[in-house]
Structures are given as C-alpha cells and as structure tokens.
Amino acid sequence: MNPKLCMLLLVCLMAFYVIETVQAKLTGECPAELEKECLNRRCASPCCKNNKCHCGCGRKK
C-alpha cells in the first residue's frame, strides 16, 4: 500500500478518536471504550456517567 495513503488513514483515525473523546467530555457522556467496559460489568443495569462506571442506573426510586 502507498505510504502516503497509510499515513492519511492513520491521521484520519486519530482525528476521529480525538473528536469522539472531546465531544464526550463536552456533553458529559462517556467515550465508547468506557461504555463497553461498563456494559461488561456484572451488575443489574450498568451504565457510564461522568467518565465512571455505575451500577443500577436504570432503577427508579
């Protein structure tokens, strides 16, 4: 593969990651990677808030 094309692809992937991370911080949501980690937790209803995993977010009091 063309080295310039590889570099362009790498830059695009890095930009996508940075944009997703910044957008998540601005909106108060968690990045996709942390969302996946939270969903793998073994609790009733895992979720991600303020960049931390929590259990029981779906429960209503």
Curated annotation (Swiss-Prot):
It is found in: Secreted. The keyword Signal applies. Keywords: Disulfide bond, Secreted, Signal, Toxin. GO terms for cellular component: extracellular region. The keyword Disulfide bond applies. Contains 4 disulfide bonds. Residues 1-24 form the signal peptide. Expressed by the venom gland. One of its GO terms (molecular function) is toxin activity. It comes from the Eukaryota. Belongs to the scoloptoxin-14 family. This is U-scoloptoxin(14)-Sm1a. It comes from Scolopendra morsitans. The lineage of its organism: Eukaryota, Metazoa, Ecdysozoa, Arthropoda, Myriapoda.
